[in-house]
A protein has these predicted regions:
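Beta-sheet repeat architectures centered on beta-propellers
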Residues: 1-166
Length: 166
């Protein structure tokens, strides 16, 4: 449970298409319906993301180099005119080090090697990137109104790329 979604009662039955919940301000809200947050007077985008676990092609001293990504994303059901998401490749040089840019809160990110961020829309066939690191993770996120997306199986052109130096 992340964020604030105060609900005092829920109702879900096979008769209704979507579950209903009562808010702490005495409103009934239909859940799981639509692409945006319609609880307030105006629609708000729902910030959504998914981040993979870290992966690499070898353990030990080898780095991984990625130069192409086939995103495999679907935007079926979007109400936005041009739906898009941000796809990030997060690389780190050491296990357990922060992999985002800028440095993680409270410290220096000495393990960071590279970060690739590209916008992906329904017409994106492949991304040309240059990312090198010992371990990688993929993050896909959306903060736009009317954007509904589904991630399939992204394909990465990966290869070993030298040894880690000290």
């Amino acid at each position: 449970y992340v964020g604030s979604m105060g609900r005092s009662a829920w109702y879900d039955s096979p008769i209704n298409d979507f579950p209903l919940a009562a808010t702490d301000t005495y409103n009934l809200v239909e859940h799981e319906n639509g692409n945006d947050n319609g609880q307030g007077a105006t629609l708000e985008a729902i910030d959504s993301f998914i981040t993979s676990g870290q992966f690499g092609i070898e353990s030990g001293t080898s780095f991984t180099f990625i130069d192409k990504v086939v995103p495999d994303l679907s935007f079926v059901g979007s109400t936005a005119g041009s739906p898009s998401v941000e796809m990030s490749l997060l690389a780190s040089s050491e296990p357990g080090t922060a992999d985002n840019n800028p440095a993680s809160e409270g410290g220096v990110n000495e393990g960071q090697v590279a970060l690739a961020v590209d916008m992906v829309d329904e017409y994106t066939d492949q991304l040309d990137v240059r990312v090198r690191g010992r371990q990688m993770a993929i993050k896909v996120q959306s903060t736009s109104l009317g954007t509904k997306w589904q991630l399939g199986t992204p394909r990465l052109n990966m290869r070993p790329d030298g040894r880690r130096g000290r």
